Amino acid sequence: MVALDKETVAVCLLDDDPSVLRATCRLLDSVGWKVNAFTDPTKFLEHAATHCPDVAIIDILMPDMNGLEVQARLRRVSPATRVVMLTAKDDPSVRRMAMTAGASAFFIKGVESSEFLAGVKATADSLN
């Protein structure tokens, strides 16, 4: 399998915490990923419906719409988008629900940068 060029893979990030959003964007940018970042689930879904990102990195605990609901709605508007969940809550039942609903990876915030980046890369590579 040939890895996709980071420049050609569309990545979207959704997290309601602006500081986490900035830090995650910086991390992805540091290795060449270009990211569209959102704090609002509705705006994220509107963007996904028109741009169909290759990979979506989604927080689970958000006030207006939780990440599992975003994941379900994303499947309807952009079914080919691969999902990576990134959350502060390590809950096995939530992990199971996300993975059963089609998430490619599930990470707890604070994960080692190299592990997270490897997971995003593996998710992008699965597009081939």
Indicate where each model-derived feature is located:
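Two-component/phosphorelay signaling modules centered on CheY-like receiver
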Residues: 18-36
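Acidic catalytic/metal-coordinating carboxylates
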Residues: 39-40, 66-69
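Alpha4 helix (beta4-alpha4-beta5 surface) of REC/receiver domains from two-component response regulators
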Residues: 69, 90-105, 111-114
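Non-catalytic signal-transmission and effector/linker regions of two-component phosphorelay proteins
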Residues: 1-12, 18-19, 25, 114-128
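The feature encodes the CheY-like receiver
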Residues: 21, 63, 91
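Acidic, metal-coordinating helix/loop segments flanking the phosphotransfer/catalytic sites
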Residues: 37-55
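Active-site residues of response regulator receiver
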Residues: 59, 87
